[in-house]
């Protein structure tokens, strides 16, 4: 249910080519990183992969994979999930791993939700030192 946030790292300098879409448009905003600590997004994102996400102004305006924090039993918990905004303002929260249930957050259930950014890439980390 939870994903590890080895804290959200500060913005990183990156080669422009790394985050350019198929139309040649660079991802706007600052790029930040964290490490995936759970299996809820398998097979799309593997545990321990480095996730790069772009500042989205704290809002989910279109479907995608987002990094967000919510209070769980009074403590902040970081989630990396597929989020689909609905016309009524609710958010459908989806794990790609079918062992996890999809759930909906109504507008009144989103007050403790802080959206950190939209995931733009994940990368396998192999350390050599």
Please state what every model-predicted region is.
Residues 4-13, 17, 24-129:
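Acidic/glycine-rich C-terminal interaction modules and beta/coil loop segments
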């Amino acid at each position: 249910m939870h994903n590890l946030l080895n804290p959200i790292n500060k913005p990183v300098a990156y080669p422009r080519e790394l985050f350019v879409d198929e139309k040649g448009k660079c991802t706007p905003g600052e790029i930040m990183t964290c490490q995936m600590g759970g299996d809820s997004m398998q097979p799309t994102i593997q545990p321990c992969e480095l996730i790069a996400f772009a500042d989205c102004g704290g809002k989910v305006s279109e479907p995608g994979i987002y990094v967000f924090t919510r209070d769980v039993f009074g403590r902040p918990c970081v989630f990396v999930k597929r989020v689909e905004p609905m016309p009524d303002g609710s958010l459908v929260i989806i794990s790609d791993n079918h062992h996890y249930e999809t759930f909906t957050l109504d507008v009144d259930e989103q007050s403790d939700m802080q959206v950190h950014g939209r995931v733009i890439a994940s990368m396998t980390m192999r350390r050599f030192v």
